[in-house]
Amino acid sequence: MRIEDFSLKNVSSSPGVYLMKDSQGVVLYVGKAKNLRNRLSSYLQKNGDSRERIPFLMKRTADIDTIVVSNETEALLLENNLIKKYQPRYNVLLKDDKTFFCLSISLQHPWPKIEAIRTRALSPSKKKQLLFGPYVSAEACYALLEVISHWFPLRTCSDREFSTRQRPCVLYEMKRCLAPCVGFCSQTEYQETLEKAILFLKGEVDTTIANLEEAIKKASQEHKFEHAAALYRTLTLIRQTMAKQHVEKFQAYDIDVLGLYRKGPLAIISVLSVYSGKLLGARHFTFPENAQEDSSLFSSFILQYYAENTRIPKQIFVPVSPDSPELPYLLNAAEPPKIRCPKTEYGKELLALAHKNAAEQAKPLNSITLPYEELQQLFKFSQYPNRIECYDNAHLQGEHNVGVYIVFEKGSFSPKQYRTFSITSHGDDLAAFEEVLTRRFRSLTTELPDLIVIDGGRNQFRRAQHILEKLNLTGIAVVSIAKESGNHSRGLQQEKLFCEAFPQGILLNPTSEILQFFQLLRDEAHRFAINRYRNKHSKAILTTKKIPGIGKTKTTHLLQKFKSWKRILSASEEELKTVQGLTKKDIQRIQEEGKRAE
């Protein structure tokens, strides 16, 4: 069936939900309407809805199904359920993954501790539990935990270790724990320290900042510049994560502020979380192919984002009112939040800040416009390359050889899906590439890409095709990108692309969006490969060449703490004492090696 043949005669004028499908019956988009006939009429008329993303959607639609309901509230709930069921390409769809970084305090233990966790739910899962966050990143979360352990000496050990300890650990000697495990402090003293830490996490950071500034000044006066620099880094992280910001005028409120950026089918929503005048964090959601109206988009987003156990603030600021007045009462909150477009100057400033955050997220996408249609037309791909994998490898004179692939999916990089391979073959780059590709596709448990991109010329392109043929994966498209020596255009080096449509290669203008898109993929893969190589190289040096007595387990703990060989050798004795498993002899050997390396 062609969409031009779709008839409105049998479409009801009642509230309901409509499902747009492609020629294969796949649901592309789910929408709701107060009047189904009027809404679909606006889509089907030639001069109806002229928004850029609507023709983009209708061009792919072959049929429309409708479901009639009693009222708008039922339509909203049904729309949300169908979006979850069919996961349409052009709707808002939030992935239910563990992306919240929080700090948790379990009050069930008589001597509570603060620990970093990752969780879906932003409301406590236990009756006696406090959650703080979410924080912008794992780095911010662990930085706060480090500050707390320094200024609020609470225990960090497991409950089992706490119950079996006979003497205090090294953290007590460093004045970073009150040692309640061996009775060195009273419960009243410990509780007072815990309450101060809780106030800090709620945003009362002024006293801590003042103490840090005084400590930095004292360390500088005593010429302990390395220690002063470490304190300054901590102070900077606190200010970035917890200090008063532009939102300080809303000191009494618990607010989420939703900002929206749109460009064609691209939609980005930023959520700023404000508590007691502090900007606690921001989360960003990118929908590369969204066809919803702004009011409908916010209804879908809010219903999904605040589903079930998610933290629900008292107020939600939005630039456009959701199209469902009953929305606050559909959320799982004891007190329905107020969802509104603020009229005050301060509220408008917050919305502007949220919009700016959303626009900032779009910059990497806007600088390289995603040329999906151009890619398909130029290279004659059989389908849209929604999932792209780019491969690279790194080594030094054949040692510590690593191969990697990165994933670009639905309009953005997906670092969680990046993978690393330790290369075992001892041939050239082609042999290493063949090993990586073979190992990647030998197991088909991971989702297959629509397109793979490799750094190399005609030989790499042919080798990739040969491997895919052997694995019976000829449906995966391949593009190889190679620098064209001697060819320059306006100071920009030209590069040649090899693919099935152009097996001898094609030269594109250096300003071409397609070329820049592939360069972006290749550069990200190269960056990831170099980082993986450096980690492997550092670990190899540490375990096999440099320091006796530092085995695999201690190496892992050191690298988790300091990230690189250079930082390990420059670490102070106090910093090294915080690494699990290191003895005084180990610390002495590391510092001796550091002096030799200077």
From Swiss-Prot:
So what family is this one in?
A: Belongs to the UvrC family.
Q: What's the short name of a Pfam family annotated to this entry?
A: UvrC_RNaseH
Single GO molecular function: excinuclease ABC activity
Question: Which keywords does the record carry?
Answer: Cytoplasm, DNA damage, DNA excision, DNA repair, Excision nuclease, SOS response
**Domain annotation GIY-YIG: ranges:** 13-92
Q: Where in the cell is it found?
A: Cytoplasm
Q: Which organism is it from?
A: Chlamydia muridarum (strain MoPn / Nigg)
Q: Note whether NADP occurs among the keywords.
A: no
What job does the chain carry out?
A: The UvrABC repair system catalyzes the recognition and processing of DNA lesions. UvrC both incises the 5' and 3' sides of the lesion. The N-terminal half is responsible for the 3' incision and the C-terminal half is responsible for the 5' incision.
- One Gene Ontology cellular component annotation? cytoplasm
Q: In its UniProt entry, what is this protein called? A: UvrABC system protein C
Primary localization: cytoplasm
State the source organism's domain of life.
Bacteria
| SUPFAM superfamilies referenced in this protein's UniProt entry, alphabetically | C-terminal UvrC-binding domain of UvrB (SSF46600), GIY-YIG endonuclease (SSF82771), RuvA domain 2-like (SSF47781)
Cite the Gene3D superfamilies for this sequence: 5' to 3' exonuclease, C-terminal subdomain, GIY-YIG endonuclease, UvrC, RNAse H endonuclease domain
GO BP term (any one): SOS response
Question: What residue stretches are annotated with the UVR domain?
Answer: 206-241
Keyword RNA-binding in the entry? The reply is no
